[in-house]
Amino acid sequence: MFLLPAWLVIDPETAKRLLRYRYACLPAAKRSAEAGGYRGAQFPWESAQPEAGDVTPATVEGWVDPATGRAVPILEKTDEIHITADVAYAVWQVWQGTHDEAFMADYGDELLRESARFWASRAQWNEVKQCYDILDVIGPDEYSEHSDNNAYTNWMAHVARFVDLSDFYDERAAIRTILLQFRGEFRVKRNPNRIFTAFHFENNRPFTVAIFLGIES
């Protein structure tokens, strides 16, 4: 989210290499999603060798919860899932910055498609609100555990539906087909336009979102 836009201006090929790395991580990301009971690809919070998947330790070494006597879990490993939407958003940024159709055909389209599949399976329909919830996550502050409808996470998943509004939608047929599949993944879950994106405030000031979404308090 921070490095790729800079590289896109300074050296677009480096920006594309960053996403080719994510593409190399796809098999492991698909295994991670499947292990959690989801479809598509769930990209890791901490990543190293592409085939290794998420290298985040399961617990904090040497730390014990005094209340339970158990090792303190690192919940970011499973719950900080906005990374998957971040990858999809980065693909879109590269397309906007380069209009490299070969890159999109070889790498970008599949990254978008598998990200869409993950979010479609991760979101839960809320009959009362008539929208989709994304429950039990950690936002980019890395401290707010077990959050429901974290503003940044939900907004990024919502932004992943940019194809309805973008010029990209009208580009070449092969790429357009992928984007229709991206949107269609959400249509399977009743309505592609409804995901809970209300923002939460503390003391009349937005938190977390102010940093990552540029919302003024």
Residue map of PLM features:
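Helix-terminus loop motifs that line ligand-binding clefts
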Residues: 13-89, 95, 102-106, 115, ...
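Short, glycine-/Ser/Thr-/acidic-enriched flexible segments
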Residues: 8-9, 50, 94, 139, ...
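Glycine- and acidic
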Residues: 1-4, 67-77, 92-102, 140-142, ...
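Active-site core of glycosidic bond-cleaving carbohydrate-active enzymes
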Residues: 1-25, 106, 162-217
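Pocket-edge structural micro-motifs
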Residues: 45-47, 136, 199-201
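Aromatic- and histidine-enriched alpha-helix N-cap/loop-to-helix transition segments
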Residues: 7-10, 78-89, 107-110, 149-159, ...
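Acidic/histidine-rich catalytic neighborhood
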Residues: 114, 118-161
